[in-house]
Amino acid sequence: MTFLQNASIIVFPEYGLTGFGYTRDSFQPFLEDIPDPKKTSWNACEDPQANSSSPILYRLSCLAKTYDMYLVVNMGDVKPCNKSTDENCPSDGRYQYNTNVVFDDKGKLVARYHKQHPFLNEMKVVNRPLTPEFITFDTPFGKFGTFVCFDALFHDPAIPLVTKHKVDHIVFPTAWFDVVPLFAAIGFHGSWARGMQVNFLSANSHVPEVLNTGSGLYSPTGAKKYYRSLSANGSLSVATLPKSPRDRPSGTPVVNATKIQEGNAGQDSFYSDLFGDLFLFKELKKPEGTLDVCYNGSSICCSLTYEMVEKRSDEMYALGVFDGLHILEGQYYLRICTLIKCLGLNRNSCGQRVYNASTIFKSFTLHGSLGTQYIYPQVLADGVSLLPGEWDHSVPVTHLQTKQQLTKGLLTAALFGRMYELDDGPRPTTHPSVESSAPQICIHVFFVGLLSVIAYFCVEKE
């Protein structure tokens, strides 16, 4: 394992030690009572009792010490409670948490984080902390924060870790369901690094048959290394990341924003479903041009200037905008501008899952007037791949633009905006012009009995 000799930190996936498919009771034997490192200084590898009382923590601590690196692992934490003294205590007398643990290079436990936003059926197995935990840890190579999977879509704890606690790096165990066009793991996680100007180390479980795939090491200027595959084989990814990710290199373009004219949807626009949300689209009918679209005549608008190498007769592209409360498999308020390839030549296919594209864009600039500071830019290309050196974005994010002619066909480009303060708003109503037969796209959650650890990451010391 010579590749680990100069590594600073390694990150393993969510549920990488246990796999999925548990009930609350069947998960219990895999849990350990993890102490709070803020209250207790503990090195399990140097504790004579730990091997018998906490065998998982003991082995992890010794691995970190043996290989002289920081170790980030997702596991289960259990905390006994009594209903007579704790009104929130579950009926079975224990709290169970999806938990990240971090050990330093000497084996000392330095961080423990309980997942704030369990995903769907996971809520039947683990508890949600009563208040969000903002967990950071300091290293010789920067300040880190950590959260898990579905947490990335919400304000707490993710956003304050960057804005208030000033972390430069995020370590992110996940079991992310890879859903194009806007929720592909490599696209969304890379966009979070760009939008929040941090390094983002994402270790995803690799079970392609249930849509778990896509891991990477991302900086504010793009992916340093990533892996996405539908084969059964996982991959180790190793990359060097900057200690100070907010120091953008000279020459990075910053585009001045211009106001998009508000207007009605117009006859050329149409609605279509994208992962449960009714986007307003305009088709790209010519090989080059400029399009504007505003959501229902509001001030939430998108503009696209583009030029294709060739307008292919077998592929259709559309510019889309959405402003509303997303309620499919979670509730969160979105404001999005996106340029997407449609599945077919029918307008109703715009927003459905597409994995391949042949149309090459010479250039494009996507601009959004989204009314939020939280915008995450992403570009996906043919085969669900990234083009990190071929496009850039403004800071703050209002524009996304190509730096050169793209080398692959374009699947999607997006400015993914979040209005966190509106997440508890009323459920949206269906637009009257959309027929009830509009196609719906859903993620179906499957569980597997055993999951091997196959994605983990190292950031080499500079």
Regions found by a protein language model. Name each.
Residues 26-28, 424, 456-459:
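Residue-level recognition of conserved structural "scaffold" positions that shape functional pockets
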Residues 436-462:
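Cleavable C-terminal sorting propeptides in eukaryotic secreted/cell-surface proteins
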Residues 2-106, 176-199, 204-209, 325-326, ...:
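Cys-nucleophile CN-hydrolase/nitrilase-fold catalytic domain and related Cys-dependent amidase chemistry
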Residues 46, 82, 90, 150, ...:
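Secreted/luminal cysteine- and crosslink-motif detector
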Residues 13, 155-158, 173, 377, ...:
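Proline-rich low-complexity regions
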Residues 204-439:
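C-terminal beta-strand edge segments of enzyme domains
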Residues 49, 58, 62, 66-67, ...:
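Active-site catalytic loop in hydrolytic enzyme cores
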